[in-house]
């Protein structure tokens, strides 16, 4: 993915692109993702709207040239772990870089991911802590096994998601999964990670990354998909 300085994301390599709906549990808390409508990335490159104002989302239609937005890419080049707090628990550690919060709220059920990590000597708390940290789409939270010091990560194929948050009535960022590289038009390559969320509403203060602003402004992309496809995790428990 190339992030143009004043326009769209240019996607190369034809990764699959689909809506990813945040689905709630019985308490209306974020619990799993479910795939929605698929979109083509056959065009090489495929231009994905970054300003939030396109009339043919998720694709760019040139609206960025007249839209009321600040396209500047202000995110620092630091690695995600460089600014992360470490939460120490019984059998787990969890890294937390709050700057990358996208307000997906998978960390809230059953207490919260921080409390569950601290209580991870308990097998059920450990299982839930790993689940909640791993579901964080941006990688803000990551659970680590204290014995091996290896992170818990879903094995994502290179793919893109358009996050849809039906509980709060907003559309989220561009979920970049499976180590797809993202670089500035000028050449700088951002840290390559398994989980990244880039801004689609045009209003993040940490571009190109999403900072959750879409939730406070209730930004909607107007896509007409439904959550009918595969779920993450595959078995919803």
Q: Model-predicted segments: where are they?
A:
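Ferredoxin-type iron-sulfur electron-transfer modules and their immediate structural context
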Residues: 1-18, 73-105, 172
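Short, structured motif recognition centered on aromatic/hydrophobic residues
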Residues: 9-11, 46-51, 58-60, 141, ...
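Extended intrinsically disordered, low-complexity coil regions enriched in Ser, Thr, Gly, Ala
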Residues: 21-26, 64-75, 147, 215-225
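Ferredoxin-like iron-sulfur electron-transfer modules
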Residues: 35-50, 82-103, 113-134, 146-152, ...
